[in-house]
């Protein structure tokens, strides 16, 4: 008995000590909020003008693109009985390349892209491109600023289906959105930097500076993929500016969160997970990540090398981009020629490829992966450990790259005021399920407003302190006990 008590005390001591390490919260780093990312050194006088911009698919670009596709070398056919398991099915790719040359209407597509007002302005030395749509609101309808941030390999084009839904008054809501959809630096029509170190933290600073230039000291954010990384850092660094954060790729990267995932796999009965089948067994998730993360490792280590091939060949660029857009739209369709790409409108997909091709920005977009992995940027890593009190809403689509239950998300986002899960949809929510995304943004912002307007709306983090592992397990056990006795 004495040995048992001693062992229990020792184990408890280990857990307490381990918790103090993995649950450590670092101090906010000191950052230069006007760091110069343009060529050379910062000039004494800076251009802060806002310039109208038009997208142009010019004849020279179109002619060169088509000629390169027509002159491509013979593509290697898939193995017998293989569809998309080895990557892009080249028989299916041939059909898309033919469509791109013969049927993709470049002029019609550019007119569609230009239906929104486009602008450029220099932020910290880089020419940033953004879409800015102001709604025509009726009396009594409040206009709320919303910053939208995309990821790889996209641009602000990703939001062209959802923008009209967000800028149109919606029945049951007394507000509508003024949308600012920005291209991340080095993506789309935004200039890339020639200086190392421009990571998601620094991009978050730039996006805040963009909104301040547009006159918005307080605003909401909607983001996914890399955009969600940038936005998460914004909520950590600038909570006074962010009224609410809608995230369609919600992740807590705190060490305590990763520890909980492991504990949950060992003791699943202790874990209060809303959809455990999306998390466990962990080996299935790791198997998926191992299978599909080859591009991540390439872009995180030697982006410039693979960039040579992708910059020189539109056929190669199309295959590279479309294969990832396919798998992120439905990972269960590898046994089909399209591999999941059929879930997206092919014109939307080719818009993304064409924009990347014409701007020669595949290398500058991929370099963001290298900067993410560079551990020398210690403040970037430390930022993950700092919780934020900015209210956050999570929307989780079935085929998102990763999934975390709410009790883990609260480690980072202490005021998780809304969470919805869907048994459909994927990573490119604004293209794949724009109506659902727009509806969720409206509903979430309504919760954000409620959060700010009433003192009775307490933080779920305070009611369920899941950052404490022991409390997490106790809460789950008490919850299950209530269910058992009801």
Residue ranges and their predicted role:
Residues 13-15, 299-466, 473:
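C-terminal subdomain of alpha/beta-hydrolase-fold enzymes, centered on the catalytic histidine
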Residues 1-30:
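Terminal signal-anchor or tail-anchor transmembrane helices
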Residues 201-219:
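Conserved acidic catalytic loop of the alpha/beta-hydrolase fold
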Residues 169-174, 217-259:
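Conserved hydrolase catalytic core segment
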Residues 61-134, 360, 364-378:
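Non-catalytic accessory segments flanking enzyme active sites
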Residues 166-189:
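Conserved alpha/beta-hydrolase
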